[in-house]
């Protein structure tokens, strides 16, 4: 059965009408006086930095706000006020009238369920048969651009790439053919090529199903090609609202002008220093296992014949699309995965070190992972997380406390943050905690895997300024993995471009960007 929708929609009918929506905690406003309306075919972009009220406004539209929050105003969908109806009616409206693609598919997709159940679950809950559900899921997977959907049906989320996970999320949201689709940061951690593919896909699906589309983003320049209406939020207040092209031509607020200014400049020049890392003929291969006994049938190359050098205080940017080998290279450098070739760090070949010597050298070589929410233990306070690396050393508790405080100060977090848990922090604050955890052991080289991908432009600028300052004061070297060329240009002295596991470009940053 092919999913279609009649195109004889009444263009004057409002699918969504929000009147003076305000949301607050007991003592703090989160959103103040939001007004908007949407018709079929409209694309609205809601843009702002972390904590501006973007996501919470859309959770309100979905009827998913925590009960402890105070709300006022009206959200009218299908002639009903979402803020006043009972849970049963809300459940019916969710999926049938309005659906949402959440920001991080890795956490939003149930790791214990196969794709077939994830996508088809709502269809079955609405009374559909399993046979029809499977047909619909296969068609939806085709519609969202997944090749070989019959094979993907049986896969678990961890077996999918980032782009595939995002497409599965979109399919799950579309299964009941909603009239309004909300996409919360749908391209945050994706490379530039995948970003374009996902946004083009959303627009084509909008046209096919006659939906209204709400794009939530921290990147004003990213949504320019895809939205016709724009709301800019700052600290819970609407600072700009209207037709997108008009706002781009003549932004009224200073805040919007700052968001539009996306050139972060070039990396600061450094004095020539001694070499601390030399990589020669580095290769990473993953086994391909098939058959009943899961035997190795061959190997796929993740990193192929990579060579480069890094000096003290120098920053190397590694860029490439998803699957190009960036993260595999980073994991190989700290020997978290097996590799072949020579990794000469501070005069020692990491691939030849015994475990005891490897543990010792890891204090000088630290990695900050892409998703701080996933890499920070939710049961530990910030102080405990940062102190973890010091526990293996013979250091007194008093000195550990002092070093933790010093590390937090370096990343511009106040002492009071020690007692908070990861879920109590913003995205930028969590990234600073992950950075402090690496800095507390006083490394000479930091490997940063997409550290700014989930951050808004303002927080990105602050993070880049912080990394620049740390590079000067701590004499750090960086290997900076990213898909954002503006960020790489701002921080790195050299750039390496990977494609299909191979180096296709390796030269000084200014030379590459001025070519």
Give, region by region, the residue ranges found by the protein language model.
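ABC ATPase "signature
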Residues: 238-242, 250, 506-507
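Conserved ABC transporter NBD signature motif
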Residues: 70-81, 341-349
């Amino acid at each position: 059965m092919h999913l279609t929708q009649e195109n004889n929609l009444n263009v004057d009918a409002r699918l969504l009408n929000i009147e003076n929506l305000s949301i607050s905690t007991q003592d703090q406003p989160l959103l103040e006086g939001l007004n908007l309306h949407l018709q079929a075919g409209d694309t609205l972009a809601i843009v702002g930095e972390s904590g501006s009220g973007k996501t919470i406004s859309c959770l309100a539209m979905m009827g998913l706000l925590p009960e402890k929050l105070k709300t006022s105003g009206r959200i009218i969908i299908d002639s009903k006020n979402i803020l006043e109806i009972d849970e049963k009616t809300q459940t019916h409206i969710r999926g049938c009238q309005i659906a949402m693609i959440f920001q991080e598919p890795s956490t939003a997709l149930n790791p214990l369920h196969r794709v077939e159940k994830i996508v088809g679950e709502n269809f079955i809950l609405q009374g559909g048969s399993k046979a029809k559900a499977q047909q619909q899921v296969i068609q939806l997977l085709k519609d969202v651009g997944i090749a070989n959907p019959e094979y993907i049906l049986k896969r678990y989320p961890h077996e999918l790439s980032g782009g595939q996970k995002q497409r599965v999320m979109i399919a799950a949201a579309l299964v009941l053919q909603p009239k309004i689709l909300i996409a919360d940061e749908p391209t945050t951690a994706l490379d530039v090529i995948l970003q374009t593919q996902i946004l083009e896909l959303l627009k084509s699906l909008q046209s096919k199903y006659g939906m209204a589309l709400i794009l939530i983003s921290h990147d004003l320049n990213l949504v320019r090609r895809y939205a016709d209406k724009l709301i800019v939020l700052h600290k819970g207040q609407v600072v700009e609202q209207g037709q997108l092209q008009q706002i781009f031509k003549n932004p009224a607020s200073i805040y919007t002008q700052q968001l539009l200014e996306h050139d972060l400049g070039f990396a600061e020049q450094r004095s020539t220093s001694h070499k601390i890392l030399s990589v020669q003929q580095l290769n990473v291969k993953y086994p391909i296992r098939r058959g009943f006994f899961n035997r190795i049938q061959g190997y796929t190359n993740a990193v192929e014949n990579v060579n480069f050098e890094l000096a003290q205080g120098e920053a190397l940017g590694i860029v490439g699309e998803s699957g190009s080998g960036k993260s595999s290279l980073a994991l190989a450098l700290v020997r978290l995965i097996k590799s072949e070739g020579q990794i000469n760090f501070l005069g020692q070949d990491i691939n030849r070190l015994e475990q005891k010597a490897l543990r010792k050298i890891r204090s000088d070589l630290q990695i900050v992972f892409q998703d701080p929410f996933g890499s920070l233990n939710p049961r530990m306070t910030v102080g405990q997380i940062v102190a973890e690396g010091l526990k293996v050393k013979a250091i007194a508790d008093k000195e550990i406390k002092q070093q933790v405080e010093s590390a937090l100060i370096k990343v511009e977090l106040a002492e009071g943050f020690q007692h908070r848990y990861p879920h109590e922090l913003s995205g930028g604050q969590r990234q600073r905690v992950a950075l402090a955890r690496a800095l507390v052991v006083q490394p000479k080289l930091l490997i940063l895997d997409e550290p700014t991908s989930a951050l808004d432009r303002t927080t990105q600028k602050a993070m880049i300024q912080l990394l620049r300052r740390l590079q000067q004061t701590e004499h750090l070297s960086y290997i900076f993995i990213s898909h954002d060329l503006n960020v790489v240009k701002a921080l790195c002295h050299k750039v390496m471009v990977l494609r299909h596991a191979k180096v296709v470009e390796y030269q000084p940053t200014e030379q590459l960007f001025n070519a």
